[in-house]
Amino acid sequence: MTMYAKNNTSGKDMLSLLEWNKEELTDIIKLAVAMKTNPAHYSHILSGKILGMIFDKPSTRTRVSFEAGILQLGGQAIVMSSKELQIGRGEPIKDTAHVMSEYIDAIMIRTFSHEKVEELAYHAEIPIINGLTDLHHPCQALADLMTIYEWKDQLEGIKLAYIGDGNNVCHSLLLAGAMVGIDIRLAMPKGYEVDETILAKAENLAKQSGGKIFVTEDSKLAVTDADFIYTDVWTSMGQEDENAKRLADFGEKYQVNAELVSGAKPDYHFLHCLPAHREEEVTTEIIDGIHSVIYQQAGNRLHAQKALLAAILEAK
C-alpha cells in the first residue's frame, strides 16, 4: 500500500470508475490537491518507475499531462502509437500485454474500443489506465471532481448540470458524481442519451451516496440553481461524418449561452473538458467569461493523474 493513500490501491487498474469506491476516489482528489499545493514534496516518489503510453487517438491534454506528471514524480514515460508497435501489425493484445509487463510499471492507453482496454488489463501484470475510450474517460472525471472540490470544499450536494451528448465524458462524470453524492442533471435530445447500463449503475451508486440523478430534454430545467454547468462537443472524434446531423439535432436549444446560464446560481462555474467548438455547444462569451474555470479544470488533469499514479504504483 502506498504511503500516500489510505486504501490499498497499489496495482489497481483504472479502466472506468466502476472498479473504484467513494473512499478511494475521495482519497485521490485530496491527494491531488496536496500535490498541487506542494509539488516538491512528491517530486521523487515514483523514482525508477516507467509509464508506457499508447495512443490510437490524437491527444493534447492526456499526453502532456501524463508525461509531465510521471516526470514530476521522478519517473519516466515512453510514448508510443499502435502503428509503432507489433500490435498495429496484428500481434495479439495478449502477447503485447505480457511482454510490456516485463519492461515497464504501468500502461496508459488512449484508444477507441473499451473492450481493447479491458483485454489489455486482463492479460497484463501491471496497472492499466484508461486515457480515454469511446465509453469512458475516467481521468477527466477525476479532474472534474478536483475542480469542483477546490471551489466548494465539498462534493456532496453540489448541483451539476451537464448539457449535451451522452458520450464518454458524460458517462464518467455521471459515475463519479453519483459515487460522491453530487446532484446531477443531464439534458440531451432523444437519440443522444447516456448508455442505459451505465445510467442504471450510476443510479445505484447515487442511492448509496445520497446523490441524485435527473435526466431531461429540457436544458433550462437542468440548469436551474446549478452550481456548475458542464458541456462537451456535440461531435466527437470518429463522428465527423455525422457532424451536420448532430449540429441540427442539438442546435441552440442545447447551447450553453447567456440565456441558458441565467437560470443557474449567480456564482455558478462553467466546465468543459476541451477541446471546445466555440459558438456550437458554448458561446465565446461564456467559455471566455468570468464564470469559466476551464483552464483550471484542464490543469487539474495533471494533478489528478499524478495522484492516480501514486495510488496505483508503489510510491516511495
From Swiss-Prot:
Chief subcellular location: cytoplasm
To which pathway does this protein belong?
Answer: Amino-acid biosynthesis; L-arginine biosynthesis; L-arginine from L-ornithine and carbamoyl phosphate: step 1/3
Tell me the gene name.
argF
Its function, per the record, reads:
Reversibly catalyzes the transfer of the carbamoyl group from carbamoyl phosphate (CP) to the N(epsilon) atom of ornithine (ORN) to produce L-citrulline.
Q: Which biological process annotations from GO are given for this protein?
A: arginine biosynthetic process via ornithine; citrulline biosynthetic process; L-arginine biosynthetic process
Protein name, as recorded:
Ornithine carbamoyltransferase
What HAMAP family does the entry give? OTCase (MF_01109)
Q: Where does carbamoyl phosphate bind?
A: S59, T60, R61, T62, Q86, R110, H137, P138, C139, Q140, C273, L274, R301
Give the PANTHER family listed for this entry.
ORNITHINE CARBAMOYLTRANSFERASE, MITOCHONDRIAL, ORNITHINE TRANSCARBAMYLASE, MITOCHONDRIAL
Do the record's keywords include ATP-binding? no
Query: What SUPFAM superfamilies does the annotation carry?
Result: Aspartate/ornithine carbamoyltransferase
Q: Which GO terms describe its cellular component?
A: cytoplasm
Please write the reaction equations for the catalytic activity of this protein: carbamoyl phosphate + L-ornithine = L-citrulline + phosphate + H(+)
- Per the UniProt entry, the Enzyme Commission number(s) are 2.1.3.3
Any one GO MF term held by the record is:
ornithine carbamoyltransferase activity
Location(s) in or outside the cell: Cytoplasm
Q: Where L-ornithine is bound, by residue? A: N168, D232, S236, M237
Alphabetic keyword roster:
Amino-acid biosynthesis, Arginine biosynthesis, Cytoplasm, Transferase
Q: Provide the organism lineage as a comma list.
A: Bacteria, Bacillati, Bacillota, Bacilli, Bacillales
